[in-house]
């Protein structure tokens, strides 16, 4: 809470001093039904989308927890490391959201196309760096978060296996976030919501059925765990197909409905 409040305070002071036109005056505090409608139109589908995605994550976490305490410890190790790896991709998508929104409002559609192209190039550049870091450190990540004497072979296996499967697929997350930003910036929030449903279905189906299909005699085997690890990349792939395909159609085929 303190960190978030400090961040808000510093940011507010900065833009208040740097950008006078962003200073809120009493005359600005009034309701505009068109703006309210747009906020609900964009915000509600995205809110529901994140709720749906968290449901899928809960299902995956429940299945991983069934593998025992070592698997649970591995989750606490690889999740923050995964977050570190994806920071560049997340930052680019956030910047792209603002860029698309501004240029869509100004009807500078060619700049949006250029921004998409440049972001993909930057995603690929960061991806290769992430790939090297993720694969080379996969088996060493537990030592970062837990004492060396507690990092047994099972924890290292669960953590390294997940990262070795996930890291090569992080380019999908970059494309997913880029597509989501483009769709949000062009006020098409319903498509990310639908992709979230597809992602949820894909993740749940893999978590529920793949372990038993791989090893029906022992659905908690190492091979079954590997199958569960693929649930995240498959969910990303489903979202990329839905949202990426929509971006191609809207931006390049329909030219923003022009």
Model segments located where?
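Small-residue-enriched core segments of transmembrane alpha-helices in multipass membrane transport
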Residues: 80-81, 197-206
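Hydrophobic/aromatic residues in alpha-helical transmembrane segments
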Residues: 11, 56, 60, 96, ...
């Amino acid at each position: 809470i303190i960190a978030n409040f400090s961040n808000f305070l510093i940011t507010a002071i900065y833009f208040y001093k740097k950008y006078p036109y962003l200073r809120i005056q009493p005359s600005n505090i009034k309701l505009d039904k068109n703006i309210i409608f747009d906020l609900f139109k964009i915000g509600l589908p995205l809110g529901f989308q994140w709720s749906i995605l968290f449901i899928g994550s809960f299902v995956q976490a429940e299945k991983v927890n069934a593998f025992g305490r070592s698997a649970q410890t591995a989750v606490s190790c690889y999740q923050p490391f995964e977050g570190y790896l994806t920071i560049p991709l997340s930052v680019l998508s956030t910047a792209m959201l603002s860029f698309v929104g501004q240029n869509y409002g100004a009807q500078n559609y060619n700049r949006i196309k250029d921004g998409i192209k440049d972001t993909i190039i930057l995603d690929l550049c960061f991806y290769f760096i992430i790939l090297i870091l993720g694969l080379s450190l996969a088996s060493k990540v537990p030592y970062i978060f837990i004492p060396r004497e507690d990092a047994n072979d099972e924890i290292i296996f669960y953590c390294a296996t997940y990262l070795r499967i996930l890291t090569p697929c992080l380019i999908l997350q970059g494309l997913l976030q880029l597509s989501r930003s483009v769709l949000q910036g062009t006020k098409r929030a319903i498509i990310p919501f639908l992709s979230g449903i597809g992602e949820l279905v894909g993740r749940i189906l893999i978590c529920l059925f793949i372990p038993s299909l791989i090893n029906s005699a022992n659905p908690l085997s190492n091979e079954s765990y590997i199958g569960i690890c693929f649930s995240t990349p498959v969910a990303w792939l489903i979202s990329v197909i839905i949202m990426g395909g929509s971006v191609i159609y809207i931006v390049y085929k329909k030219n923003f409905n022009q």
